[in-house]
Amino acid sequence: MESGKPRKVKGLLGDELAWADFLISKASLVLASAVLFAAVFQLAVAFKGLEAQEELDFLARDFKAAVDNVGADNFPGKTQEISYRFDENEVFLASQFGEDIEVYVSGEYVHLKAESGGVNFSAVRPFTFRVLPFNEAELRGKLYARFGNDGSEKSPLSVDFQEIIEFLRVSGTEEALLSADEDISIKKEFVYIRGSEEVSAFEYVLVYQ
C-alpha cells in the first residue's frame, strides 16, 4: 500500500499540470483573439478615416475646378457666372459628414473642414486664378474707397497696376465662411485701369453667397 501512494500523488500532479497547461493555452487563445480583434478594429477605423479624407479632398478639388473653369473661360470683356452647390454632388450626399462640412474661401484657396467619429478632417486646394471672396458691389466699394474710382469700365482706375493687385490681394486674405447647402456664386469680373494711351482690364473670379 505504501508503494502505491507516491504514484497516486504523481498522477494528481500530472492532472493539475495538464489542466494548468489547458488554462494557459485557453487564456493565450483568448488574448490572441482580443489582440487580433483590436488590430482589425483599428484597421477598420484607419480605413474609414482614410475614406473620409478622400471624400473631403474630392469635394475640395471639385470646387476648385469649378472656380478655375470660370477663370479659364476666355470671352474678353464679358463676365461669366455659375452657381455651385455642394449638396448636388453625389460624393457630398454619400459622405460620412452629412451636411456638416464648413466651406471657407479666401483669395488664395478653398478650405473644407469636417468632423466624423470625433476626428477632425481638413482639405485645402489653392486656386489657379486671382480670386476674391466677396461680390461685385463689395469689390467696387473697396476700390472706390481706396482709389476714388470703382474700376468699372465707366470709371477706370488711374493708379499703378501693382498697387491695385497688392491692395486686392490683402483685401482677399481673410477667409469667408460659405454654406454648403446653399448656392455659391462664382463670377468673373473685370477691373479696368487707364494707361497712358488706352484703357485695359484684368480679371478676378468672385466667390460669394
What is each model feature region?
Residues 2, 10-48:
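N-terminal single-pass transmembrane signal-anchor helix
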Residues 38-209:
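Long, compositionally biased, intrinsically disordered regions
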